[in-house]
Amino acid sequence: MRLYRDNAVVLRQHKLGEADRIVTLLTRQHGLVRAVAKGVRRTKSKFGARLEPFAHIDVQLYPGRNLDIVTQVQTVDAFATDIVDDYTRYTTACAILETAERLAGEERAPALQLHRLTVGALRAVAEHHRPCELILDAFLLRAMGFAGWAPALDDCARCSAPGPHRAFHVAAGGAVCVQCRPPGAATPSPGVLDLMDALFRGDWASTEQVPEWLRGQASGLVAAHLQWHLERQLRTLPLIERARPHAAVGVEDSVRQDGDRDSTTRTPSSA
């Protein structure tokens, strides 16, 4: 079989034997690829450091039956240098990588848009020109859009009645009108859905003066919407929430609900 070359982001890695590692890559043309990097744990390895998580690389691989084999690596962007020494940046970048892997779909399914989005998000976190929570929420909203899970933020998610609407219900698909509003719908503060829409569209100018408590409400809704569709919580989000207490995933402390059940949670039988 012929060698192939692709642009990739290293999502994660784990040990294999005494000297090798298995790396999970999000590639531009081949989607998720799992490959063996032989000998990279040896001190004299010529490309071991280039295969650390957060790395943006140009990689050459040899197709294998179950796992491909890394034969050559060149660094495109060493994002880890500006990420790993800062807790907030590190946990944000970890959430980006975990989400990218979960939303990439089957192995080798092309994921050009998600790859481009992931590289851009890691670059934004590394450069730190904008708050990490806004970068993460923008990434999550757009990644959900690629997966077909984008929340309705203006028109009603159920009947398409023109908005804006005040209520938000994850199971319904986002913003809902008065007629369609189900029990347990959340009522975020004015401006929360506008912020989410601005992040989805990349309208960064509209996000600059948004207060932190309002960002927290938006973050809670974004995370809850994602986790509803994934049907289980991302491992990395609680780490971010401890650093950013206003953005609790349950959002019950910062968003008013109708009834006894929060629209952003599942019952045990429905998870």
UniProtKB/Swiss-Prot annotation:
The keyword DNA damage applies. Pfam families: RecO_C (PF02565), RecO_N (PF11967). GO terms for biological process: DNA recombination; double-strand break repair. GO terms for cellular component: bacterial nucleoid. Involved in DNA repair and RecF pathway recombination. Belongs to the RecO family. This is DNA repair protein RecO. The gene is recO.
